[in-house]
């Protein structure tokens, strides 16, 4: 991770806090898309890795998976309900809209006044309040050109930066 990268401080913080250990061999892989399993694990670790009351019932989350406790915690705390049909889809790439929504729900879904000022965020989108909250709290400024990039893959650098900014 280059020291002049926008995500340097966030990755350093996340590594020091045990939120991420990277992808192996001393690498973080900042531009690699983040999966749903990785994102809930980052959130869970940032929350102190609390024990869930029960493991999740998702058919695609084995109790032995590294993200199993994180998924159970995320469900218990209303952060995610899965992707339908009894699945969580832990290996699916997470979009920026999904990532910010997970973060917003982890923060307790605080009330937001107004809407996000991004041309690609419809006021009735499920993630509209989450994006507005993230923008108003300095968590994201979008991808430029007045856009949030709702359907773009969320990279590992982006989610760790969002998480870092949300707690600072």
Q: What positions do the PLM features span?
A:
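Catalytic DNA-binding helix-loop module of base-excision-repair DNA glycosylases/AP lyases
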Residues: 101
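Feature responds to low-complexity, polar/acidic, surface-exposed segments characteristic
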Residues: 1-8, 16, 21-40, 44-70, ...
């Amino acid at each position: 991770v280059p020291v002049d990268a926008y995500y340097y401080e966030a990755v350093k913080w996340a590594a020091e806090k045990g939120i991420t250990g990277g992808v192996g061999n001393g690498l973080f892989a900042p531009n690699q898309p983040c999966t749903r399993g990785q994102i809930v694990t980052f959130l869970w670790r940032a929350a102190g890795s609390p024990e869930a009351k029960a493991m999740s019932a998702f058919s695609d989350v084995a109790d032995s998976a590294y993200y199993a406790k994180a998924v159970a915690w995320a469900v218990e705390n209303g952060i995610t309900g899965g992707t339908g049909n009894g699945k969580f889809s832990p290996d699916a790439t997470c979009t920026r809209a999904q990532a910010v929504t997970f973060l917003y729900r982890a923060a307790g879904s605080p009330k937001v006044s107004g809407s996000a000022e991004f041309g690609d965020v419809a006021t009735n989108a499920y993630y509209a309040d989450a994006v507005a909250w993230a923008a108003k709290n300095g968590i994201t400024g979008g991808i430029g050109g007045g856009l949030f990039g709702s359907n773009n893959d969320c990279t590992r650098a982006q989610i760790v930066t969002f998480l870092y900014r949300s707690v600072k």
